[in-house]
Amino acid sequence: MAPKADPARRVVADNRKARFHYEITDTVEAGIALTGTEVKSLRGGKATIGEAYAGPSGDEFFLFNAYIPEYLEANRFNHETKRPRRLLLHRRQINKFLGATQREGYTVIPLKIYFNERGRAKVELGLGRGKKLHDKRETAKERDWQRDKARLMRDKG
């Protein structure tokens, strides 16, 4: 059985395909600069980060192409749905990501958006390299074997 999720960490958006398409080597928690209507919309749980990625713009990191829908109860002061959002990282983390993306061919992918125990919106970023087709097939084969093995053990025991 899967372990229980941390009740203080409420996941709003999950990039489930990221671990299939990328080989994630390192993960980092980052804050995200949001407007008020974005936070209210996130609490509704309708965000999508399937096509999102993080990248540098100047000397800061931004989250690009993340979809946070408009807050329905807001009036004319609503936000843009796919605007770049600034990520709150330490300088050492930014330099690490910059070095990995520019020299080594890595990509920074958002894995989850969640609210921590203090109610702050956070993004879990993964530093990953794209998998080749044969690696994806191997991952799918391993996952199927684990599922079959668990089914056999359950039926036998």
UniProtKB/Swiss-Prot annotation:
<protein>
    <recommendedName>
        <fullName>SsrA-binding protein</fullName>
    </recommendedName>
</protein>
<comment type="function">
    <text>Required for rescue of stalled ribosomes mediated by trans-translation. Binds to transfer-messenger RNA (tmRNA), required for stable association of tmRNA with ribosomes. tmRNA and SmpB together mimic tRNA shape, replacing the anticodon stem-loop with SmpB. tmRNA is encoded by the ssrA gene; the 2 termini fold to resemble tRNA(Ala) and it encodes a 'tag peptide', a short internal open reading frame. During trans-translation Ala-aminoacylated tmRNA acts like a tRNA, entering the A-site of stalled ribosomes, displacing the stalled mRNA.</text>
</comment>
<dbReference type="InterPro" id="IPR020081">
    <property type="entry name" value="SsrA-bd_prot_CS"/>
</dbReference>
<keyword id="KW-0694">RNA-binding</keyword>
<comment type="similarity">
    <text>Belongs to the SmpB family.</text>
</comment>
<dbReference type="Pfam" id="PF01668">
    <property type="entry name" value="SmpB"/>
</dbReference>
<dbReference type="InterPro" id="IPR023620">
    <property type="entry name" value="SmpB"/>
</dbReference>
<feature type="compositionally biased region" description="Basic and acidic residues">
    <location>
        <begin position="135"/>
        <end position="157"/>
    </location>
</feature>
<dbReference type="GO" id="GO:0070929">
    <property type="term" value="P:trans-translation"/>
</dbReference>
<dbReference type="GO" id="GO:0005829">
    <property type="term" value="C:cytosol"/>
</dbReference>
<keyword id="KW-0963">Cytoplasm</keyword>
<dbReference type="InterPro" id="IPR000037">
    <property type="entry name" value="SsrA-bd_prot"/>
</dbReference>
<feature type="region of interest" description="Disordered">
    <location>
        <begin position="133"/>
        <end position="157"/>
    </location>
</feature>
<dbReference type="GO" id="GO:0003723">
    <property type="term" value="F:RNA binding"/>
</dbReference>
